[in-house]
């Protein structure tokens, strides 16, 4: 049995597995949403892999199974299509790890791959947004050195997305 996490860029053969993974990973947060808001959110995350603005979608495999994914965008406008969000640095979105693969370092490996990619591009920082109920994700981001950047928080409905920045 091989316990090595392999990270690659999304290929079309993995698209359906990534869609399922996104739902399986984020479903734990469904109770924080109204039924209509959850339906809109889940539809948005499933269709995200077809977003022409995404720069790279990383896919993590463990034991030849898709167990994680992460999306990397060149800027805040491309990531969120919110003109007021003037982040001109790369943005990480939709970090997802399959529930059965949690605690095995998948999220850490995905994030470090994205960070290394951004460093190789010569960027000086990388951003992401999350919410307070994503407790384990916030802990991982802080462990990797991400710091709160309150100037780039935004809201959709009654949901506040808090910004975190890592200076490289």
Model region roles, listed by residue range:
Residues 1-3:
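Basic/polar N-terminal segments that are highly enriched at the extreme N-terminus
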Residues 97, 103-116, 143:
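Conserved acetyl-CoA-binding loop-helix of GNAT-fold acetyltransferases
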Residues 104, 121-124:
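Short coil/turn segments at alpha/beta junctions that flank glycine-rich nucleotide-binding fingerprints
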């Amino acid at each position: 049995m091989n316990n090595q996490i392999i990270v690659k860029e999304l290929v079309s053969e993995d698209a359906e597995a990534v869609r399922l993974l996104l739902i399986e990973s984020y479903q734990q947060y469904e109770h924080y949403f109204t039924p209509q808001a959850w339906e809109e959110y889940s539809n948005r995350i499933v269709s995200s892999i077809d977003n022409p603005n995404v720069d790279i979608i990383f896919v993590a495999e463990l034991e030849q199974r898709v167990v994680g994914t992460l999306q990397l965008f060149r800027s805040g406008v491309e990531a969120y299509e919110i003109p007021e969000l003037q982040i001109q640095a790369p943005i990480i979105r939709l970090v997802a790890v399959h529930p059965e693969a949690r605690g095995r370092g998948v999220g850490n490996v995905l994030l470090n791959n994205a960070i290394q990619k951004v460093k190789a591009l010569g960027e000086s920082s990388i951003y992401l947004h999350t919410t307070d109920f994503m407790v384990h994700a916030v802990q991982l981001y802080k462990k990797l050195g991400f710091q709160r950047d309150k100037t780039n928080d935004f809201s959709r409905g009654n949901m506040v997305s808090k910004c975190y920045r890592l200076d490289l």
